[in-house]
Design a protein with these regions (language model features):
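Conserved RecA-like helicase motor-core motifs
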Residues: 60-70
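Conserved short loop/turn motifs at secondary-structure junctions
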Residues: 39-44, 69, 100-102
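Structured loop/turn residues at secondary-structure junctions
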Residues: 14, 44, 68-69, 207
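Helicase P-loop NTPase motor core
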Residues: 1-62, 85-89, 120-123
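Short, surface-exposed acidic/glycine-rich loop or hinge patches that mediate macromolecular interfaces
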Residues: 16, 46, 70-71, 105
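Glycine-centered flexibility sites
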Residues: 4, 33, 67-68, 105-107
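Conserved beta-strand termini and adjacent loop/short-helix elements that scaffold enzyme active sites
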Residues: 12, 66-68, 218
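Conserved helicase C-terminal RecA-like lobe
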Residues: 35, 49, 53-55, 59-61, ...
């Protein structure tokens, strides 16, 4: 029987180079007459596909994910983005309420009440972030069950905007993972380790950006992060 083409082992320098190679090979196969829907890319773990999904999106190559959601559409990616979006834009109601509902004892109604208190606090009254979020947040009326995590949330926001300045995206992600979100993720998701790998991959990607606003803009282009 006739043999097909043998697999090729292609050494590459990094995940970005690998993604570029795979995307280029897909285009070559398409030009040879193979339909895109007949081409598949296999990978061992979801986080390994981040760069490839970005490359395919940037090149306008349509694709479907059969192993779940696209990388940037996953809940934990959007959760981390919410913290960053709130640091960049303190009047982002969607981001604030998403974060608030992660905290124990806070539901839809409590999140709405806290949002109004946040909106009317000194936190939103200046164009620049406050020197200390935690100083203001400790005065908020929160359910007793939420008090400790609410205070921790304030400390996390302090780290995202040290001395009233936005931290670089890599530092922001590290602070979010080292703060209140890690406890939430451990209690919420059964595949905690896989999601941590995703977020470590996101952190590596963020090293390309010095400005958190630019980083969030790129995420929005790639995935429509709300």
């Amino acid at each position: 029987p006739a043999r097909g083409q043998l697999p090729a082992l292609v050494p590459v320098q990094d995940p970005n180079t690998q993604a570029s190679f795979v995307a280029q090979r897909i285009l070559e196969l398409r030009d040879e007459g193979i339909e895109l829907e007949e081409i598949a890319v296999l990978y061992r773990a979801h986080y390994q596909a981040m760069e490839l999904q970005m490359e395919l999106t940037n090149r306008g190559i349509p694709f479907n994910i059969t192993s779940g959601l696209r990388f940037f559409e996953q809940a934990h990616i959007k959760d981390v983005a919410a913290f960053m979006k709130l640091a960049v834009n303190r009047k982002d109601e969607v981001a604030f309420k998403r974060i608030a509902r992660m905290l124990p004892g806070i539901g839809v109604i409590s999140a709405s009440k806290l949002w109004l208190e946040w909106l009317n606090s000194p936190i939103t009254k200046s164009d620049d972030p406050p020197i200390s979020f935690s100083e203001h947040l400790e005065k908020f009326k929160v359910p007793s069950k939420s008090k400790n995590t609410w205070i921790q949330f304030g400390y996390t926001m302090d780290e995202l905007c040290p001395d009233g300045e936005l931290a670089p995206p890599r530092e922001m992600i590290s602070s979010i993972l080292g703060g209140v979100y890690d406890d939430y993720m451990r209690s919420k998701f059964t595949n905690y380790d896989n999601r941590i790998q995703d977020l470590e991959q996101l952190k590596r990607y963020s090293e390309q950006f010095d400005d958190s606003t630019d980083f969030l803009g790129q995420l929005a282009l790639l995935s429509g992060v709300e």
